[in-house]
A protein has these predicted regions:
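Nucleotide/phosphate-binding catalytic cleft detector across ATP-hydrolyzing
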Residues: 1-146, 156-272, 278-306
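Residue-level signal for beta-strand positions within conserved beta-sheet cores that form or flank
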Residues: 149
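A structural feature that tracks compact, well-ordered secondary-structure segments
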Residues: 152-154
């Protein structure tokens, strides 16, 4: 528990971060909720709920309240935030901190207001919203912020967002592509957790100096029985080809929409990648090669918004 009056909240699609002024990041947990199917009572939140994903009995459901950059359940968001707020500030009923909220990009005004109302109801005094793209740029300069559900692409000038776009490509799309690849190439059905582990451990946007391999366990689509196959980092390049091509096409369109003066600034200063999805091996090099613009990975890319 922390004695705090002001909090920062990065409500990410896959991970939630809370920040305390003067103390930095005090909480970083997966944005998962496990609840009873009939009563909708919450039984686990965060890392505990994530560990249950894909392994729950029929009466329990584990899901992420946010998906593809959109809020799927305001009720679950409220319950999740109540849990995390108690974890950070304690159970004092009269203590209600002020909260700076990094909003997922592309939310409709009505959706934003509903989210703000839900957060206030969860136990904060007031909410100051800011776009994730702006928050990540404050942390790392002009950047491409690749989240779990979406990618925010922003160009700033004198502190103002001049050109921006929201792309339906993110870490979840990478996971789905890996699942689809193993289904087609190896007749193996794997879960989202296994796909994420493959992405993190051997996922690649370009050739590595050393070939990596990892066993992927799932269900054979031929026999219906459990089966394991060995997957290489080179196969991951093939698996991720389609979402990466979509990402590059969208980035090309964004550059074309940028005023010439700002495009010149981008060329001179380069691009910074942030967000959890930006950690895919070789992605910075692929973007740099294809856009002909120096591209670097931010320090602690998954924490840029929180910082």
């Amino acid at each position: 528990m922390f004695g705090v009056d002001e909090l920062g909240l990065d409500l990410g699609t896959s991970t939630l971060h809370m920040v305390v002024r003067g103390k930095g990041i005090v909480l970083s947990e997966p944005a998962y909720v496990a609840y009873d199917r009939q009563t909708r009572n919450v039984v686990a939140v965060g890392e505990e709920a994530r560990r249950m994903y894909g392994r729950t009995p029929a009466g329990l459901i584990v899901e992420r309240p946010l998906r593809d950059g959109r809020i799927r359940s305001f009720d679950l968001v409220s319950k999740m935030l109540r849990y995390f707020l108690r974890k950070v500030v304690g159970k004092r009923a009269t203590f209600r901190p002020k909260l700076l909220l990094a909003l997922p990009g592309g939310m409709a005004p009505s959706e934003r207001q509903t989210l703000v109302d839900v957060i206030v109801d969860a136990g904060v005094r007031s909410v100051v919203p800011v776009d994730e793209g702006v928050a990540s740029a404050i942390g790392a300069g002009m950047n491409i912020d690749i989240g779990g559900g979406r990618t925010n692409v922003s160009v700033f000038s004198f502190g103002h967002q001049i050109v921006w776009d929201i792309l339906n490509v993110g870490g979840d799309r990478f996971d789905d592509a890996i699942i689809d690849y193993l289904r087609k190439k190896h007749n193996l059905l794997i879960g989202a957790r296994t796909a994420e582990e493959l992405k993190i451990d051997i996922g690649s946007a370009r050739m590595r100096g050393v070939k990596l391999e990892m066993d992927a366990c799932g269900r054979s689509l031929v026999s219906g029985l459990p089966r394991a196959v060995t997957v290489s980092s080179e196969e991951m390049i093939e698996a991720l080809d389609e979402p990466l091509r979509d990402l590059m096409s969208a980035l090309h369109r964004m550059i074309e929409r940028t005023p010439p003066e700002l495009a010149s600034d981008i060329f001179d200063e380069g691009i910074t990648l942030s967000g959890g999805g930006a950690q895919l091996f070789g992605l910075d090099g692929v973007i740099s090669d294809q856009l002909k613009i120096r591209t670097t990975l931010a320090d602690e890319p998954d924490l840029c918004v929180a910082h």
